[in-house]
């Protein structure tokens, strides 16, 4: 319902702006409710706005030209996001500490992004600043939603990680490696990236493959880190289009705050796995300048005492605005 209401508002605003001046607005919701679980990475949401080249700051323009070989024909976007991720153990009805289970943790953040879109590749540089702990409002968010949908209230948030500020820098490159153009098109988009910070420090490799009648030059639907990045922009605005997609990502993880526990105080922790991988599949539909996408994700075990891989779904709505 929220996505439908947002789309109605944005359609009216978008119609009043010249096509060459509009940016891109996207909302992503990830939740394991669709997999009938309520544990580990249990919910995430992110709202992002990307503005086009003519509106980017002098700093973004200088960074692109200095470090990324940007010229006047390159498409550049500058973006800001706000988001929140929630993590819980398997049994949210137990108010006591649960050793060996995923610690309770909330993460609230702002993200600033620069996107450089060239013919052969897209580079994305992001900075996340935020907080882990009670100030991230994880307990309020989860239990407010659970009350709204008449679901079980989580009783163990008193055991969550303590407040800790977070800074994380990330760089990702996605290559437009290969496209087969016939009645139905197929393309392959390899990706590589690295993140450094006290939230996560990791390197990653992966790919996205898409199949459909008219594959635009975007990168697939947006996602929430550390998943496959996708794209926060829409390269075109067809009246109707669709494509199926699948993807895989492998990550080498040196640091994960929500598993390792607080850096400066005693807190719950588990022994993380240094190698994590995930697979995804979904469908995206373009209708009148909007892109609506549904993605199902399987993430491998992230810590030694985790019993099973984790499944969750992502829903995203993107529009030119």
PLM ranges: what are they?
Residues 96-100, 153-159, 193, 266-269, ...:
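Extracellular loop and loop/strand-boundary signature of outer-membrane beta-barrel proteins
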């Amino acid at each position: 319902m929220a996505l439908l209401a947002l789309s109605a508002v944005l359609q009216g605003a978008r119609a009043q702006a010249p096509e060459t001046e509009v940016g891109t607005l996207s909302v992503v919701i990830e939740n394991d409710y669709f997999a009938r679980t309520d544990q580990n990475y249990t919910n995430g949401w992110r709202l992002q706005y990307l503005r086009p080249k003519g509106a980017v700051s002098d700093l973004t323009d200088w960074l692109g030209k200095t470090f990324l070989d940007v010229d006047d024909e390159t498409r550049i976007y500058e973006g800001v996001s706000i988001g929140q991720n929630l993590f819980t153990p398997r049994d949210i009805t137990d108010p006591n500490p649960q050793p060996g289970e995923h610690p309770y943790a909330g993460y609230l953040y702002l993200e600033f992004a620069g996107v450089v879109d060239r013919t052969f590749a897209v580079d994305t540089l992001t900075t996340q600043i935020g907080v882990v702990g009670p100030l991230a409002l994880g307990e309020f968010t989860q239990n407010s939603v659970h009350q709204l949908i008449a679901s079980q209230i989580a009783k163990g948030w008193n055991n969550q990680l303590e407040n800790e500020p977070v800074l994380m820098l990330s760089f990702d490159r996605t290559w437009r490696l290969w496209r087969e153009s016939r009645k139905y098109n197929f393309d392959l988009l390899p990706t590589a990236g690295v993140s450094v910070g006290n939230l996560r420090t990791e390197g990653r490799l992966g790919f996205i493959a898409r199949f459909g009648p008219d594959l635009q030059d975007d990168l697939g639907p947006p996602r929430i880190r550390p998943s496959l990045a996708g794209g926060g922009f829409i390269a075109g605005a067809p009246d109707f289009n669709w494509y199926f997609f699948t993807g895989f990502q492998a990550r080498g993880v040196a640091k994960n705050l929500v598993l390792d526990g607080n850096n400066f105080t005693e807190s719950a922790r588990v022994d993380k796995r240094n190698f994590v991988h995930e697979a995804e599949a979904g469908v995206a539909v373009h209708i009148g300048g909007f892109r609506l996408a549904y993605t199902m994700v399987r993430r491998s075990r992230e810590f030694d005492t985790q019993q099973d891989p984790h499944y969750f779904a992502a829903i995203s709505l993107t529009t030119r605005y």
